[in-house]
Amino acid sequence: MKVLIIGSGGREHALAWKVAQDPRVEKVFVAPGNAGTAIEAKCENVAIDVCALEQLADFAEKNVDLTIVGPEAPLVIGVVDLFRSRGLDCFGPTKGAAQLEGSKAFTKDFLARHEIPTADYQNFTEIEPALAYLQEKGAPIVIKADGLAAGKGVIVAMTLEEAEAAVRDMLAGNAFGEAGSRVVIEEFLDGEEASFIVMVDGHNVLPMATSQDHKRVGDQDTGPNTGGMGAYSPAPVVTADVHQRVMDQVIWPTVRGMAEEGNVYTGFLYAGLMIDKAGNPKVIEFNCRFGDPETQPVMLRLESSLVLLVEAAFAKALDKVEAQWDPRPSLGVVLAAGGYPGDYAKGDVINGLDAAAKIEGKVFHAGTALKDGKVTTNGGRVLCATAMGSTVADAQQQAYRLAKEVSWNGSFYRSDIGYRAIARERGEHQQ
């Protein structure tokens, strides 16, 4: 069989790599893909943009049996609706269901309607009422641009001045284009974050392995937010008890609530959670797709065929399958271009990939391109060095062995990915 993966990031390289491992799969097309998917066994890039929906559907109709969507942008504009209208299997939520990620305001209102735990909040489109609300609530406080801002439209303001500047920026300056024309202001939640990703077939839910990502650009969680600088799986904060609470209080009410409201949810559903000291989960955000970089360590641990699981979802039979996981933890370190998440250079030649390929683990490509037979940088997050180990500390050590082999002009990475889990292993408890 043949499969199409839509996207060009590290997440899509990991999905394509995993799908290609199924012996029934002869070919994995990736649109538009990156240098990693260009050279991955069984994989081939297709030069179609992720938002060129008609072209994607035309290609899928002629060439593939099923499609898996990586990024949020095509989902929010209705790629699944179009594929379905043409009788094509496409794993992901419809445009209506993808509002869970496409609009922060839709999501907060949905959570309130269904009594799903989340931070207190209010939506604003005008500066004055927003500033008055800030005065009333004080800092720390969280300001979010309403639409898609590539994971960067969230400001955790530790002072009122910072909060007011963020509101002015998003509403008056419209720093995030269209996405910022409405803001959500919400209470600051204390605790530990976890990424809880499940597969949904409309009615049944199959949990994936838990993970924790590191959003801040600098060590010890300093500096601005990014799309994610590294991740590991599983997330020890999600104990068996917390897992049950998340399913009962967050995932099931969300899937049922969406169905009741006429937006039956299919695809990957990612709940970004804050877990407090008592183990109570609150929803920070939903994403309507697998996380990036969480996909990379999670796929490394998945022993089952991803294709089989997706087929079960199309058959509305996710309750009949189980996902098998390697019990060992895995950890991925993102290698980024100098200047990220701000402005960065593209087109630098990447050195050391051949040496890294000889070391245990896997270097997934994100912002890379093939130019004259050389792999060059083509984005802010460029690679993700991913490895497993008997402990998180071992997995971390192995991932950094990989990361150290690879470099280009201005490359950098965080040196402490997984620090919370490693502190737990050593018996130091950190919040």
From Swiss-Prot:
Superkingdom to which the source organism belongs: Bacteria
Record: residues binding Mg(2+): E285, N287
Q: Which GO terms describe its biological process?
A: 'de novo' IMP biosynthetic process; purine nucleobase biosynthetic process
Check the record and name the SMART domains matching this protein.
Answer: GARS_A, GARS_C
What this protein is called in its record is Phosphoribosylamine--glycine ligase
Its source organism is Pseudomonas putida (strain ATCC 47054 / DSM 6125 / CFBP 8728 / NCIMB 11950 / KT2440)
Enzyme class, UniProt record, top EC level = ligase
Q: Which family does it belong to?
A: Belongs to the GARS family.
Known catalytic reactions: 5-phospho-beta-D-ribosylamine + glycine + ATP = N(1)-(5-phospho-beta-D-ribosyl)glycinamide + ADP + phosphate + H(+)
One GO MF annotation is: phosphoribosylamine-glycine ligase activity
